[in-house]
Amino acid sequence: MKYREIADGIFVDRPNRFIAHVEMNGAVETVHVKNTGRCKELLLPGTAVRLEVSDNPKRKTKYDLVAVHKQGLGWVNMDSQAPNKVVGEWLAKQGYDYIKPEFTYGKSRIDFYMEKGEQKYLMEVKGCTLEVDGIGYFPDAPTERGVKHLHELAQAQRTGYQCAVAFVIQMEGITEVRPNVSTQPEFGTALAEAKAAGVRVLFLLCRVGRDSLEIVEQREG
């Protein structure tokens, strides 16, 4: 996936989940943050950030904060909408006969439903931006929705679907994602139960470009 236009800035602070102050060309701009997660380990004062320039002249903010430079690691795409977009592009190249985003299963909306011949597939997508000592972790904050999705995938797997949870690693140099049990042990339990039911765990490694994010490799978890 590609962004329309990218500008550079320096992170100043984040008054709330939705906006941040960024220094650009000597002035401080209020920008929209495309990730409502905490991201405290990423958004440090003085850190270089990348922003997508909005093409909507009626918007209150001209920019969306989409990437941040992490010392010792490199650029991290922190756009929470990017994982589903890149997976959608990637799935289109995987030989499926039919792909439907936002598929209702049980009491959840699963990110992707696919068909190949007679086989039906479900895939839930999770974006990973948290890195500790060269390992990716998910979630960076408790997510009851994420736990619920894993239970739904395990149930679907038992009824004949081929199911997978795909972790999109939104940074380079990281090849695996582990459940962040220190933040939410329930997610780790649900992931283990899903794997035991036959749900595949995929790590999707990405190339983080200045104005792009692209899946370059798939690994099994």
Named regions from a protein language model:
Residues G9, I110-D140, L153:
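Conserved catalytic cores of phosphodiester-cleaving nucleases, focusing on short active-site segments
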Residues N16-H21:
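Short aromatic-glycine-enriched beta-strand elements
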Residues A27-E41:
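Beta-strand/loop nucleic-acid-binding surfaces
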Residues G37-R50, A154:
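Short nucleic-acid-contacting surface segments enriched for D/E, G, S/T with interspersed K/R
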Residues K40, Q71-P101:
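Acidic-basic catalytic patches of nuclease active cores, encompassing PD-(D/E)XK
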Residues L44-N56, L205-C206:
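Flexible glycine-rich surface loops and low-complexity tracts that mediate binding to linear polymers
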Residues G134-E144, A154-T183, L205:
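Nucleic-acid nuclease catalytic cores
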Residues Q170-G221:
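Domain-level recognition of nuclease-like catalytic cores that cleave nucleotide substrates
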